[in-house]
Amino acid sequence: MLNLIQTLRMEATQKSRHKKTQIQSGDILSITTTQYKNKKRKQNLKGICIGIKKRIGYTTIQLRNFIGGVSQEQSFILESPIINNIEIIGKIKGNTKAKKYYLRTKSPSENKV
C-alpha cells in the first residue's frame, strides 16, 4: 500500500507544471491565481518567498508582503490547479539563509514589495 502511494506522488511530481521555475528563498515572486467560484477572475499576488518546503509529491512556498499597514503571509502548493503562473521578479539583498524568517522582525519597509 505504501509503495502505491509513493508511486502516485512521484507521478504527480513529474506532471508538475511549475517544475521549470527555479524558486529560492529570498526571491520576489508574482503569482497569478484563479478563484474556485469565479473561474474568470484572476488575482495577482506579490511577495517575498521566505521559505520552501519540498515534500514527496508536492512543494509549498510561503510569501510575505506588507499590504495596507499589515504584514501578510500566505502559503501556496505549487502543484495546485489554482495557480496559473509564477514569475520571478527579483531577489532581496541580505543573508543567504535557507529560511528568511528573520524578516518577521524587520521593519515594514524591508518587507514591502
Curated annotation (Swiss-Prot):
It comes from the Eukaryota. One of its GO terms (biological process) is translation. Pfam families: Ribosomal_L19. PROSITE patterns: RIBOSOMAL_L19 (PS01015). It is found in: Mitochondrion. PANTHER family: LARGE RIBOSOMAL SUBUNIT PROTEIN BL19M, RIBOSOMAL PROTEIN L19. This is Large ribosomal subunit protein bL19m.
